[in-house]
């Protein structure tokens, strides 16, 4: 099911990720969920894709997710 707001995300995602990372997760999940209609693994695929999107912009350091530094 798509998430309309960050408050609708699973509690574990809300606890783990900072707000901007939640935005990335939600947008990627919703896009992937829509793209995989008819796939029996639709929700699982959407969660995997959403985590991959977060990991492109954030890095887990200890128990925290921190924004990756941009290279110029």
What are these regions (language model features)?
Residues 1-72:
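C-terminal alpha-helical interaction appendages
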């Amino acid at each position: 099911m798509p998430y309309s707001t960050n408050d609708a995300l699973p509690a574990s995602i809300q606890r783990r990720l900072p707000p901007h990372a939640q935005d990335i997760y939600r947008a990627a999940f919703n896009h992937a969920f829509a793209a995989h209609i008819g796939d029996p693994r639709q929700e699982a695929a959407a969660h995997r894709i959403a985590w991959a999107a977060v990991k492109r912009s954030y890095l887990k350091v200890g128990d925290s997710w921190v924004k990756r530094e941009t290279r110029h």
